[in-house]
Curated annotation (Swiss-Prot):
Reaction catalysis annotation: (S)-malate + NAD(+) = oxaloacetate + NADH + H(+)
UniProt record similarity statement: Belongs to the LDH/MDH superfamily. MDH type 3 family.
Species, as recorded: Rickettsia rickettsii (strain Sheila Smith)
Single biological process term from Gene Ontology: tricarboxylic acid cycle
Residues the record lists as binding NAD(+): G11, S12, G13, N14, I15, G16, D35, N97, I120, T121, N122
Function according to Swiss-Prot or TrEMBL: Catalyzes the reversible oxidation of malate to oxaloacetate.
Top enzyme class: oxidoreductase
Gene: mdh
Gene3D superfamilies assigned to the protein according to its UniProt record, in alphabetical order: Lactate dehydrogenase/glycoside hydrolase, family 4, C-terminal (3.90.110.10), NAD(P)-binding Rossmann-like Domain (3.40.50.720)
Protein known as: Malate dehydrogenase
InterPro entries registered for this protein in UniProt: L-lactate/malate_DH (IPR001557), Lactate/malate_DH_C (IPR022383), Lactate/malate_DH_N (IPR001236), Lactate_DH/Glyco_Ohase_4_C (IPR015955), Malate_DH_type3 (IPR011275), NAD(P)-bd_dom_sf (IPR036291)
Residues that coordinate or bind substrate: R84, R90, N122, R153
Active site residues of this protein: H177
Gene Ontology terms, MF aspect: L-lactate dehydrogenase activity; L-malate dehydrogenase (NAD+) activity
Keywords from the UniProt entry: NAD, Oxidoreductase, Tricarboxylic acid cycle
Length: 314
């Protein structure tokens, strides 16, 4: 891949702007910041260019309202769409954001058919499905940002519970990116020690871990309720950067993302949050975990929720 890959960000709101800032500071590539609102991407691009000048970076950032400017992009991150407001679920956004995603997909197909695409727009599992079907891109090049964010929330709450550094915590969250997501304590560890073992040692309790799991499921809603006029953007942007960097640098990281399943986990023709390996070809492999009967039941329930949402847009 060339020295400065071309990275296009579709949507210049809070997440789009934060993404551009993080990409420029890490010097991951030159940036095209797109939005339909005139002046917004241009203004943010100018502000960001002045910010990276202080950091001594020569990364180029262009703000635009013209899809032609995404031509030849190596990677595209999509945040365009209506954000959640208090009292709204991710699923309430479905009809408006489906229309937006279809327009974005048509332009990605036209101008950047070889790009690696990360979708952030909610409801995530449906939006990434729409992107795949409408763009015609190969499924290994289209993924959704889900589990990295959900796991980061789970990691934080577990670190607080066990009073350890977040760097010691690895957690696993499967399923749809919604209220039926499946945080897995059994596959979550503190310095390699599984959470159930730590409970047996008396360092926490099943009750406390269940509360943490519930808080993780409502992690986005908790922030929406506090902000009142928007939704989370720092953590979603940081999560997408982790995925983007694994692709651009061929790091082959195993990250939980919304991936297209073709029989894995017993699921066909759906995007669901599972661990995948991301490298220079996109999704290199889906990691299939051995789930207990109870875990599989929760996962299947989450999958059913995604299926029902997909049906509403067909």
């Amino acid at each position: 891949m060339k020295q400065h890959p071309k990275i296009s960000l579709i949507g210049s709101g809070n997440i789009g702007g934060t993404l551009a800032h993080l990409i420029s500071l890490r010097e991951l590539g030159n940036i095209v910041l797109f939005d339909v609102t005139e002046g917004v991407p241009q203004g943010k691009a100018l502000d960001l260019m002045q910010a990276v000048t202080i950091a001594g970076s020569d990364i180029k950032i262009k703000g635009t309202n013209d899809y032609k400017d995404i031509k030849g992009s190596d990677a595209i991150i999509i945040t365009a769409g209506l954000p959640r407001k208090p009292g709204m679920s991710r699923d309430d956004l479905i009809s408006i954001n489906t229309g937006i995603m279809k327009t974005v997909a048509a332009n990605v197909k036209k101008y950047a058919p070889d790009a690696f695409v990360i979708v952030i727009t909610n409801p995530l599992d449906v939006m990434v499905y729409v992107m795949l079907k409408e763009s015609g891109l190969p499924h290994n090049k289209v993924i959704g940002m889900a589990g990295v964010l959900d796991s980061s929330r789970f990691n934080l709450f577990l670190a607080e519970e066990f009073k350890v550094s977040v760097s010691n915590v690895n957690s696993m969250v499967l399923g749809g990116h919604g209220d039926a997501m499946v945080p897995l304590a059994r596959y979550s560890t503190i310095s390699g020690v599984p959470i159930p073992d730590l409970i047996k040692m008396g360092l926490s309790s099943n009750e406390n871990i269940e509360k943490i799991i519930d808080r993780t499921r409502n992690g986005g809603g908790e922030i929406v309720a506090l902000l009142k006029t928007g939704s989370a953007y720092y953590a979603p942007a940081a999560s997408a950067i982790e995925m983007l960097e694994s692709y651009l640098k061929d790091k082959r990281q195993i990250l939980t993302c919304a991936a297209y399943l073709q029989g894995e986990y017993g699921v066909h023709d759906l995007y669901v949050g599972v661990p995948i390996m991301i490298g220079k070809e996109g999704v290199l492999k889906v990691i299939e975990l051995q789930l207990t009967t109870e875990e599989k039941a929760l996962f299947d329930k989450s999958v059913e929720g995604v299926k029902k949402l997909i049906e509403t847009i067909k």
